């Protein structure tokens, strides 16, 4: 029978609950236990697909085309498993489903209430993960903090799960913050005590309390929290801030949390195998070489908007004992600034995805700088479209070249709406989403990177390369190195006369893993390092 671990948060949001959950998954998987992880988001949006990156950060796309919370990216990277749309549930999805059932008459005229109808729907979504994956353990993160009004139905649902599946099959873990008061020079436990009391008020008693802090937590403080929480001292685990998020599984393992979970849930575990993870952390801490690459985007003030891109760059570096320093460059500032001033000190340039015209001309200037100065370049989604526009404007001498996203009346639409997107009015969940096959052209940089003829990559876009201009572009040195199986959709482009210039319509960053970097990022970082040697 599947066991469940429910992870709640207290005192403050953004304390690293998602990383903690992902790390728990890694600890269990390192013991031969199959794991799946689910995120319950209390917001009323159906999904984050139409939310501003400034409010939500990155939208992470799963293999089956779900637009999900960025924490799912952490989950996939830590447990090295592909997740699906059932792994991210929102209040919007829950209420939409219940209302649809009521309209169909599924409730036989009954009065629809939060309890039992909403809570039953939540529980059914949690159970669906276990059914679909047959995992030994499903770890469920409840978004937000205890005390948030939006979270109450989710807390009630996970409280009921203990009765539904048996108390021996459920474990509650509470992640809380120990704030530091500079005036008194100490960490304070009172907010954590109140958070635990609030959790108990809704009928949940945590079996483990994880204490996040920027400073070490001494034994006396842990004992104080354990006394208040009615827990053994070893069930209060200190989780201080570390240099790399990939250290967290090792910190938790050293604290004995892995064994504690195994004992509490009576899991049949193999001896722990974390040697590969320890080797990863050692490479992170002791790089042999360094290089700097720029990420040019319009959301660089909130780096969470490019979470998977940044992580993929780092993965590629660590695999080659390289520390990749990221220079964040505002594409809006680059529209008016000298590119040499902003990009002259980097060995590689990435233009990631995005939507809307704001900052696009700055991205195009970054592409031009990379092309003309032979700087390694990687374009992602919109970055590929910007590379297409730049080449048409400045290599083909077609200054009017543009995308119909930015200028619907452009005379040279080298990027245009996909035909099946023309009649779509709803914005949410209607793009070309999820994994699609890509045929790689032989003797290209893309084919060399992948080492095979077929790639399966995740997409999130409405616009595509306009094949009307394909022959003219190719004649000038623009290489179509990847396309859909029917040959109609351009998936990867590169330049013939450039050391390393590759751009993809898909999002390779969603498939990179810390111990298995994506081949396009790997070769991009290698090309950037070679710039230093030159």
Curated annotation (Swiss-Prot):
Binding site for ATP: 14-19, 71
Keywords: ATP-binding, Glutamine amidotransferase, Ligase, Magnesium, Metal-binding, Nucleotide-binding, Pyrimidine biosynthesis
Active site, renumbered: 381 (nucleophile), 507, 509
EC numbers: 6.3.4.2
Region of interest called Amidoligase domain, as start-end residue ranges on this chain: 1-267
Activity regulation as described: Allosterically activated by GTP, when glutamine is the substrate; GTP has no effect on the reaction when ammonia is the substrate. The allosteric effector GTP functions by stabilizing the protein conformation that binds the tetrahedral intermediate(s) formed during glutamine hydrolysis. Inhibited by the product CTP, via allosteric rather than competitive inhibition.
PROSITE patterns: GATASE_TYPE_1
Record's catalysed reaction(s): UTP + L-glutamine + ATP + H2O = CTP + L-glutamate + ADP + phosphate + 2 H(+); L-glutamine + H2O = L-glutamate + NH4(+); UTP + NH4(+) + ATP = CTP + ADP + phosphate + 2 H(+)
Entry's Gene Ontology molecular function annotations: ATP binding; CTP synthase activity; glutaminase activity; identical protein binding; metal ion binding
Family annotation (Gene3D superfamilies): 3.40.50.880, P-loop containing nucleotide triphosphate hydrolases (3.40.50.300)
Additional detail: CTPSs have evolved a hybrid strategy for distinguishing between UTP and CTP. The overlapping regions of the product feedback inhibitory and substrate sites recognize a common feature in both compounds, the triphosphate moiety. To differentiate isosteric substrate and product pyrimidine rings, an additional pocket far from the expected kinase/ligase catalytic site, specifically recognizes the cytosine and ribose portions of the product inhibitor.
Function: Catalyzes the ATP-dependent amination of UTP to CTP with either L-glutamine or ammonia as the source of nitrogen. Regulates intracellular CTP levels through interactions with the four ribonucleotide triphosphates.
Subunit details: Homotetramer.
Protein name: CTP synthase
Lineage: Bacteria, Bacillati, Chloroflexota, Chloroflexia, Herpetosiphonales
């Amino acid at each position: 029978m599947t066991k469940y671990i429910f992870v709640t948060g207290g005192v403050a949001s953004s304390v690293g609950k998602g990383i903690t959950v992902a790390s728990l998954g890694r600890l269990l998987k390192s013991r031969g236990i199959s794991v799946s992880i689910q995120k319950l988001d209390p917001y009323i949006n159906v999904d984050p697909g139409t939310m501003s990156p400034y409010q939500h950060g990155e939208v992470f796309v799963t293999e089956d085309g779900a637009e999900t919370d960025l924490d799912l990216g952490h989950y996939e990277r830590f447990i090295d498993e592909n997740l699906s749309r059932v792994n991210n549930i929102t209040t919007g999805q829950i209420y939409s489903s219940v209302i649809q059932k009521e309209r169909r008459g599924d409730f036989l005229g009954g009065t629809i209430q939060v309890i039992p109808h909403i809570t039953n729907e939540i529980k059914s979504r949690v159970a669906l993960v276990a059914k679909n994956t047959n995992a030994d353990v499903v770890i469920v993160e409840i978004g937000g903090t205890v005390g948030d009004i939006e979270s109450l139905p989710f807390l009630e649902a996970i409280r009921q799960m203990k009765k539904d599946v048996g108390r021996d099959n459920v474990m509650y873990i509470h992640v809380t913050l120990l704030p530091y008061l500079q005036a008194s020079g100490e960490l304070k436990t009172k907010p954590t005590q109140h958070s635990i009391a609030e959790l108990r008020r809704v009928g949940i008693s945590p079996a483990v309390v994880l204490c996040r802090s920027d400073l070490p937590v001494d034994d006396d403080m842990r004992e104080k929290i354990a006394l208040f929480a009615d827990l053994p001292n070893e069930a209060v685990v200190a989780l201080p801030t570390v240099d790399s998020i990939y250290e967290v599984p090792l910190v938790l393992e050293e604290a004995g949390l892995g064994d504690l979970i195994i004992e509490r849930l009576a899991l049949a575990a193999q001896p722990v195998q974390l040697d590969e993870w320890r080797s990863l952390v050692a490479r992170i801490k002791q790089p042999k070489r360094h290089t700097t690459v720029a990420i040019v985007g319009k959301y660089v003030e909130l780096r969470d908007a490019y979470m998977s891109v940044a992580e993929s760059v780092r993965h590629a570096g660590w695999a080659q004992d390289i520390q990749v320093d990221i220079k964040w460059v505002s594409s809006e500032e680059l529209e008016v600034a000298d590119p040499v001033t902003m990009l002259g000190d980097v060995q590689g340039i990435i233009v990631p995805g995005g939507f809307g015209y704001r900052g696009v001309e700055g991205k195009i200037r970054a592409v031009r700088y990379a092309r003309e100065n032979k700087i390694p370049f990687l374009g992602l989604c919109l970055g590929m479209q910007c590379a297409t526009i730049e080449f048409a404007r400045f290599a083909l001498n077609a200054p009017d070249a543009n995308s119909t996203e930015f200028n619907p009346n452009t005379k040279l639409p080298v990027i245009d709406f996909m035909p099946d997107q023309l009649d779509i009015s709803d914005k949410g969940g209607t793009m070309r989403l999820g994994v699609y096959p890509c045929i790689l052209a032989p003797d290209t940089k893309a084919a060399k990177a992948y080492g095979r003829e077929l790639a399966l990559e995740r997409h999130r876009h409405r616009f595509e390369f306009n094949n009307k201009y394909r022959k003219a572009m190719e004649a000038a040195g623009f290489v179509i190195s990847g396309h859909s199986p029917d040959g109609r959709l351009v998936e990867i482009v590169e330049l013939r006369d450039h050391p390393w210039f590759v751009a993809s319509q898909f999002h390779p960053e969603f498939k990179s893993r810390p111990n298995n970097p994506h081949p396009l990022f790997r070769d991009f970082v290698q090309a950037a390092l070679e710039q230093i040697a030159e």
